[in-house]
């Protein structure tokens, strides 16, 4: 994340995705907020989930994420937007969400998917602009 190039953008994308799982489990969104662009839908949804867990007394178990960008050097920054569009392979461990009474309200099995993570710079720091499905074609 220390370099202002595709390698730095890839490191920021991997870190943010992995931090998302931690933020939910720890109910701590401080680092996630700092890297979330105000227009990022995925970011907003994740921050809302953390806030819900904190206010409702619910908990999130499992869900650890591992993120990987294969060959970051092949990605180029969009000159008009300044954004690096990166394809990130994400493995998420099985997870369970319970309410304050310990009643399971959601669960997901382990999954592997590829997501498009758009990474930009703001005031010299990396920010996540969006995380979405990889465009077809």
What are these regions (language model features)?
Residues 76-137:
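Exposed beta-sheet edge and beta->alpha loop/turn motif
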Residues 23-26, 68-86:
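N-terminal short leaders/motifs
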Residues 1-61:
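Core segments of small alpha/beta cavity-forming domains
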């Amino acid at each position: 994340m220390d370099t202002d190039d595709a390698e730095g953008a890839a490191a920021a994308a991997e870190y943010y995705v992995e931090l998302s799982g931690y933020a939910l489990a720890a109910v701590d969104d401080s680092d996630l907020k700092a890297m979330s662009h105000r227009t990022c839908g995925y970011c907003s949804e994740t921050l809302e989930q953390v806030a819900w867990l904190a206010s409702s007394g619910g908990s999130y178990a499992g869900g650890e994420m591992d993120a990987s960008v294969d060959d970051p050097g092949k990605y180029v920054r969009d000159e008009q937007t300044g954004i690096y569009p990166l394809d990130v392979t994400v493995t998420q461990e099985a997870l369970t969400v319970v309410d304050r009474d310990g009643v399971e309200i959601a669960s997901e099995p382990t999954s592997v998917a590829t997501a498009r993570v758009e990474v930009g710079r703001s005031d010299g720091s990396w920010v996540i602009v969006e995380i979405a499905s990889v465009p077809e074609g």
